Regions:
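Protein-protein interaction/assembly regions in multi-subunit complexes
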Residues: 1-170
Length: 170
């Protein structure tokens, strides 16, 4: 039976808070690397803890393909930008955040009105651009979870049907 050796040969955290690590596990027989890699990926994805915006309600919007007068991005682009927001939550309970911005403005995650249990990691994360006289108003759910969870179109946690569910970030 071979003695396996694992070694971290490179590790860093980028300015956008993404982390990178390169490890060597040896010696492995032919085909064992793929088997070990797949098992490791599954374990990591199912056990990583994360916080994300999981549902959104935007004032005056009834579907994700709509546009908002005076806002450069359409609703789908705004939703994709919201999915990129990196959040930390100190509560296991669902939290509600709000956003109300008058144009002209460049809307960022720093404009969010969040409960004290939730914080934005990068307050400069871009959401949308508003022209003069326009308004962007929304309410969104923030949830903490483990692993990856796909869209659940059935439930909005008490939100009305105009809510747009998002996939949870891991």
């Amino acid at each position: 039976v071979a003695q396996f050796k694992i070694e971290c040969i490179e590790s860093n955290t980028d300015t956008d808070r993404s982390q990178y690590g390169k490890f060597v596990l040896e010696p492995l027989d032919r085909g064992q690397g793929t088997t070990v890699g797949n098992a490791l990926r599954r374990v990591l994805l199912s056990n990583l803890e994360g916080t994300a915006v999981t549902a959104v309600r935007i004032a005056g919007v009834n579907h994700e393909f709509a546009t908002i007068p005076g806002v450069r991005e359409d609703v789908l682009e705004i939703l994709l930008n919201l999915k990129e927001i990196v959040l930390n939550s100190y509560s296991n309970q669902r939290q509600i955040g709000r956003l109300l911005v008058q144009g002209p403005a460049t809307v960022t995650a720093g404009h969010f009105d969040l409960p004290s249990e939730v914080e934005v990691v990068d307050k400069n994360q871009y959401i949308a651009t508003l022209s003069p006289g326009s308004t962007l108003e929304m309410e969104f759910q923030v949830e903490k979870g483990t692993g990856y969870r796909a869209i659940d179109r059935g439930g909005g946690g008490g939100f009305v049907k105009s809510i747009t569910p998002l996939k949870m970030q891991g």
